């Protein structure tokens, strides 16, 4: 490292990249709630084709990390659930 590098301003590319990452994170967070609602309804529709399920017994959890989002879905299916004809 040179003594001249201590007083040099950082280049604009890393700053722009960081700003873009923050902007994308905000956009993904805003779209996430809509996506979760859509996924919930579609997953319920698919499961309901095969087994009778109470919609109130479905729990959805979304965990977001820096690089990954995890969607966890718990569907409570009774042991005596009636299989539906497809």
Swiss-Prot record:
Domain of life: Bacteria
Keyword flag Cell cycle: yes
Record-linked InterPro entries: MinE (IPR005527), MinE_sf (IPR036707)
Keyword Magnesium belongs to the record: no
Cross-referenced Gene3D superfamilies: Cell division topological specificity factor MinE
One annotated GO biological process: cell division
One Pfam family linked to the record: MinE
Assigned keywords, A-Z: Cell cycle, Cell division
HAMAP family for this protein: MinE (MF_00262)
Family, as annotated: Belongs to the MinE family.
Known function: Prevents the cell division inhibition by proteins MinC and MinD at internal division sites while permitting inhibition at polar sites. This ensures cell division at the proper site by restricting the formation of a division septum at the midpoint of the long axis of the cell.
The protein's name in its UniProt record: Cell division topological specificity factor
Species per Swiss-Prot/TrEMBL record: Allorhizobium ampelinum (strain ATCC BAA-846 / DSM 112012 / S4)
Gene from which the chain derives: minE
């Amino acid at each position: 490292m040179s003594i001249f590098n201590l007083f040099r301003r950082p280049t604009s590319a890393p700053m722009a990249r960081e700003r873009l990452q923050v902007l994308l994170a905000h956009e993904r967070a805003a779209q996430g709630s809509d996506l979760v609602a859509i996924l919930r309804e579609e997953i319920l529709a698919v499961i309901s084709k095969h087994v009778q399920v109470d919609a109130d017994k479905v729990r959805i959890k979304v965990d977001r990390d820096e690089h990954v989002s995890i969607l966890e879905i718990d569907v409570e299916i009774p042991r005596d659930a009636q299989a539906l004809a497809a």
